[in-house]
Design a protein with these regions (language model features):
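Short, glycine/acidic-enriched loop or turn micro-motifs at the edges of active sites
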Residues: 24-26, 105, 130, 167, ...
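A positively charged, amphipathic N-terminal helix/segment that binds anionic biomolecules
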Residues: 176-247
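Conserved non-catalytic scaffold segment of RNase H-like nuclease domains
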Residues: 2-123, 137-141, 145-159
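Residues immediately flanking
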Residues: 22, 102, 128, 222, ...
Length: 247
């Protein structure tokens, strides 16, 4: 008997996508914890489900993060803790491709929240930054705000989970249209496609702000001591290459 099996990544029709954004506490002694999450489930044609919740991070939100997101301790004081919404996140994202702008930041933060609960959360990932670089080349910046401004996508409530998720969804739909034959989506969903695994303890804006020009960069350890110095023609691309999955 011969089985004619087509892996899901060879046919992107019928796939559901969970487009996600999380806001977090940023770096801190107790780690990077989620303060807000938004999920839009997309069937490749339209949004079919929405989910949003503030989350009590069980730690103080730094002032700098409150200035960035507008989320403060009072807003999340009565919000559910992550373990109270974990079942919702699992159910909503089951059988979906996990999509985000700089996907590994959001994915790793959520993955760590589940790991702390002893649950092995795993989903296939798709990054709208990588897709945009491939399908809309040559832009000066691929941060969500500047990218949306460049191509005319409205972005309201910047640095709030639902605002960023709605903008990412509009970007995602544009990318789907640009990839009419789905060759790029297929190649990025193919097992073995390299993705940068961003450290979950760093705010994703740090990576958004990296310049795409020639220069020198360096890494510091937790004591602020320089542990690595590099040079690159494209600083952002080179820095991200340090975090590519090796598998």
């Amino acid at each position: 008997m011969v089985w004619d099996v087509v892996p899901f990544w060879m046919n992107t029709t019928g796939i559901k996508y969970a487009i996600i954004d999380v806001e977090t506490t940023g770096m801190g002694i107790q780690g990077n914890r989620i303060t807000e999450i938004a999920i839009l489930v997309h069937d490749g044609k339209q949004v079919i489900r929405e989910y949003h919740s503030l989350v009590n991070p069980e730690s103080a939100i730094p002032y700098a993060i409150t200035r960035l997101t507008g989320i403060n301790d009072q807003m999340v004081a009565d919000a559910p803790k992550f373990y109270e919404i974990a079942k919702d996140v699992i159910e909503i994202t089951t059988d979906c491709v996990f999509v985000a702008h700089n996907v590994n930041f959001d994915y790793n933060v959520i993955h760590k929240e589940f790991a702390d609960l002893g649950f092995p959360y795993k989903r296939k990932k798709l990054c709208t930054v990588r897709l945009s670089r491939k399908l809309i080349p040559g832009l000066p910046s691929y941060s969500l705000g500047k990218l949306c401004a460049s191509i005319g996508i409205p972005l309201n409530d910047r640095h709030r989970a639902m605002g960023d998720t709605k903008a990412t969804t509009l970007l995602f739909e544009k990318l789907l249209r640009l990839d009419a034959e789905q060759k790029v989506f297929t190649s990025f969903l193919k097992p073995g496609s390299r993705q940068a695994t961003l450290p979950p303890g760093l705010p994703k804006d740090i990576f958004d702000q990296l310049p795409e020009r020639t220069g020198i960069y360096y890494f510091r350890d937790e004591k602020e001591e320089i542990i690595y110095v590099g040079k690159a023609l494209n600083i952002k691309k080179r820095v991200l290459s340090h975090f590519y999955d090796k598998k």
